[in-house]
UniProtKB/Swiss-Prot annotation:
It is found in: Cell inner membrane. It is an enzyme of class 3 (hydrolase). This is Undecaprenyl-diphosphatase. The keyword Protease does not apply. It comes from Campylobacter curvus (strain 525.92). GO terms for molecular function: undecaprenyl-diphosphatase activity. It comes from the Bacteria. Bacitracin is thought to be involved in the inhibition of peptidoglycan synthesis by sequestering undecaprenyl diphosphate, thereby reducing the pool of lipid carrier available. Keywords: Antibiotic resistance, Cell inner membrane, Cell membrane, Cell shape, Cell wall biogenesis/degradation, Hydrolase, Membrane, Peptidoglycan synthesis, Transmembrane, Transmembrane helix. Belongs to the UppP family.
């Protein structure tokens, strides 16, 4: 890949991965506007590694304690500390895992068009706006297994390009009475196993197809996506602690209309 392609697409992935604005919409739009070829499977794996590193580093002060409580709860077969939060993340991952394995081929075949991405970007932007009006006070530590499964079902919708995984999970959490910060934190925690699964599947495909790649290019892509994703998460959390999701809703609507203009 050209160095400019690597920098731009890595920044796009890092900036949009955790914001409720649909990374897939941007990764379709940028190459389309610039006339660039598909970035390839190896690049996808690299930026997934980068964004995963970013979110793990963001939760560095709590993630090891959460994992400790989780594994101790397994050994003792009882709730320990904040183990329920980790169990909730695990259960929230199940719906997307099941639907992904069952319908991934169909989704790839029928929903990867620019028009579909444009329409879903607009529709679920409106959903985010409506959900933001229902904002509550629950934090991520108030999540139950039942609530996690509901949010997990919403996450399964993000298999459709343009929906936005972070956008739909935050929307579901807001509808269920979570605060903006609480919904974002739980959404980000949910992203860890999802990115691991997606990156793992892509890695398997990469190995099976014996695709050639340049290690320095992949390292650069991972680094740029990691740094940009971490900065965006920090800024996003600062923004929603002080104001509503409206700026992101407006951006989605503008983006969706722009995509319709390009692809219709």
């Amino acid at each position: 890949m050209d160095i400019v392609h690597i920098i731009v697409l890595s920044l796009v992935q890092g900036i949009t991965e955790f914001l409720p604005i649909s990374s897939s919409a941007h990764l379709v739009l940028v190459p389309k506007l610039l006339g660039w070829p598909d970035q390839g499977l190896a690049f996808d794996v690299a930026v997934h590694i980068g964004t995963l590193t970013a979110i793990v580093f963001y939760f560095k002060d709590s993630i090891f304690g959460l994992l400790r409580d989780f594994f101790v709860s397994i050994v003792r077969r009882e709730r320990v500390g904040d183990s329920t939060l980790v169990w909730a993340v695990c259960f929230a991952t199940i719906p997307a895992g099941i639907f992904g394995l069952a319908f991934n081929s169909l989704i790839e075949e029928y929903t990867r068009s620019g028009i579909v991405i444009a329409v879903t970007t607009i529709i679920f932007g409106v959903v985010l706006y409506l959900a933001d009006k229902r904002v509550g006070t629950k934090s991520e530590y108030d999540v139950t297994i039942k609530l996690a499964l509901i949010i997990g079902l919403a996450q399964a919708l993000a298999l459709i390009p343009g929906v936005s995984r972070s956008g739909i999970t935050m929307s579901a959490a807001l509808f269920l009475g979570f605060s903006r910060v609480g919904s974002a934190n739980f959404s980000f925690l949910m992203s860890i196993p999802i990115i691991l699964l997606a990156g793992g599947l892509e890695s398997v495909k990469l190995i099976r197809h014996d695709i050639s790649y340049v290690w320095s290019d992949l390292a650069l892509a991972a680094l740029i996506s990691a740094v940009s994703a971490y900065i965006c998460v920090k800024l996003f959390m600062s923004i929603i602690s002080k104001m509503s999701m409206t700026p992101f809703v407006v951006y989605r609507l503008i983006l969706g209309v722009f995509l319709l203009f390009i692809f219709v």
